[in-house]
Amino acid sequence: MTVHYVHEGPEPQESRYSIPQHTTWMDPNNRRLRVITIGAGFSGILMAYQIQKQCANIEHVVYEKNHDIGGTWLTNRYPNAGCDVPSHAYTYRFALYPDWPRYFSYASDIWEYLDKVCAAFKLRQYMQFRTEVIKACWNEEEGQWKVRLRRQRPGQEPEEFDDHCHILLNACGVLSNPKWPDTPGLHDRFKGRVIHTAAWPDDYGEVQWNSDRVAVIGSGASSIQAVAGIQPHVGHLDIFVRTGVWFGVLAGNTGAPTKIYSEAERAQFRSNPSALVEHTKSIEAEVNGMWGAFYRDSMAQKGASAFFRQRMASIIKDDRLAKGFTPTFGFGCRRITPGDPYMHAIQQANVDVHFTAVASCTEDGIVGADGIERLVDTIVCASGFDNTYRPQFPIIGRRGVDLRDKWKTNPEAYLGLAVPDMPNYITFIGPSWPIQNGSVMAPLHSVSEYAIQFLKKMQNENIRAWAPRQQITDRFNEHVQEWVKHTVWSDQCRSWYKNNETGRVNAIWPGSSLHYQAVIERPRYEDFEISYADANPWAHLGMGWTMLDRAGGKQADVSPHLCLENIDPVWFKSIGGDVDILRKQLEKGHTLPNNASHAEA
């Protein structure tokens, strides 16, 4: 029996939809986009390269508040300022560098590398310096960010102006806003010199230190590096320490004078790229090899804690110092810091270590929480950076939501890179990001690739706006906080990984660096609210033309599916084909398909 379905109801109205006649499938020329990146450090330089390399019809500008590139590695010039990750693991994958002068580099070495990258790829053409973002507001009607900027040219009054963009990339990082100690009298009572390690003055060097009584506040990485640099030269050094420190060894780095690469080694790396890659991979294997030690009660955690406690005791001979510096928390709760020179410096005759907080400053010195005043000429604040993740300027998203308010108590991001209510916005090194395990370079590349995928999707599908859903973001952060309970970061310690008032861990990704890279390899678009520039979201299909169709004639390969790469060797052998010939033809300019079976049966 045949059943006929009869449409009931009014006849459909004539569609008001009109297909865009000149739209071509997947053609970037369909839509020009403007991108603003904030900051020209490692992340901003990376995005300048990625957009130049992978995109078309994109207008990209990088605004940098400083006078040049480099971010942290431009501004941090305190004595011995450097990176505790091996040089060859601290490079872009597209720009492995044979000429690193030493195994662990100083800030000036790293800046020189970044300068060479920008020169090689002409990336400064996208950058505007001495230009600071002071406000960013999302315009829902236009589907764009309006960005207010302040430019400070030398010898001129500051100039404010507006710009706009479809995508806003925040590459400010977490080490860009120095944090001063909240110490009464530090700035308004003390008559001596006050210095922050993140803004070390050019006129304070060995000559000025020679007879100074110097106080250092803090026991993090900048303190550990700076103390070792100034101790041999100052008249006297007072160091104020509130918490124990894990003096670790990171991929062979003890903080002591590092291996210098010979000219012969550098020449080999230049002439043999495979040797350079092999050396870099061997370092990465070491850098990422400690992941298991961060889980509570694991054998790796217990073994690492015992080893480094014993190692510290063998170097620090003074019982009081050894007891004060030995942590009461697990290995890795605070960032592991190579510090052999520091451990030797604190035992010298011109050094006093005070295991007390700083209570206040007098005109002539520092009063500790123990009530004792120490007379000093200079105070060095090695107090790190504001790590609350709150932006330094207003970022106003949908419905007037200010990211500074949204993140006032608990900074929560989607996969460490996006935020609900902040459309078309990606941040680098956001909350819950793999800052704790190995070099940041591979995860940074993954975030840049993630941003490129969204940028291309906006172009190809004429997307107006996208932002992660609040509910899915909440569930992700619920997972993060539950995961933390199983790790060393749940221990009681003061760390920039945490909100030290509440104890909440804000910085850590719930897994290894490799885990993060795998998770964000492809965006989960189902986690996003997406709106389109056209009323009909299928308008980007156009009149059915592809770029190959438009090219036509002999210029177009209208059968790209027919190629050697798609022939499975198993099939070819089963029908009597010569697999060796197939492989040789592929090797002339092709590779075997990733999904091809390699069985020879």
From Swiss-Prot:
Disruption outcome: Impairs the production of sterigmatocystin and leads to the accumulation of averufin.
Site positions per UniProt: Transition state stabilizer: 335
Cofactors that this protein relies on: FAD
Residues reported in the UniProt entry to bind FAD: 42-43, 64, 73, 84, 90, 133
Keywords: FAD, Flavoprotein, Monooxygenase, Oxidoreductase
Top-level class of the enzyme under EC nomenclature: oxidoreductase
Domain of life: Eukaryota
GO molecular function, one term: monooxygenase activity
Signal peptide: none
Induction per the UniProt record: The genes forming the sterigmatocystin biosynthesis cluster are co-regulated and induced on oatmeal porridge or the fungal isolates were grown either on oatmeal porridge or in YEC medium (0.2% yeast extract, 5.0% corn steep liquor). Expression is positively regulated by the cluster-specific transcription factor aflR that binds the palindromic sequence 5'-TCG(N5)CGA-3'found in the promoter.
Pfam families in alphabetical order: FMO-like (PF00743)
BP GO annotations: sterigmatocystin biosynthetic process
Pathway(s) served: Mycotoxin biosynthesis; sterigmatocystin biosynthesis
EC number: 1.14.13.-
Role: FAD-binding monooxygenase; part of the gene cluster that mediates the biosynthesis of sterigmatocystin (ST), a polyketide-derived furanocoumarin which is part of the most toxic and carcinogenic compounds among the known mycotoxins. The first step in the biosynthesis of sterigmatocystin is the production of hexanoate by the fatty acid synthase (FAS) units stcJ and stcK. The polyketide backbone is assembled by the non-reducing polyketide synthase stcA by condensation of the starter hexanoyl-CoA and 7 malonyl-CoA extender units followed by cyclization and release of norsolorinic acid.
Family assignment from sequence similarity: Belongs to the FAD-binding monooxygenase family.
The protein's name in its UniProt record: FAD-binding monooxygenase stcW
Organism whose genome encodes this protein: Emericella nidulans (strain FGSC A4 / ATCC 38163 / CBS 112.46 / NRRL 194 / M139) (Aspergillus nidulans)
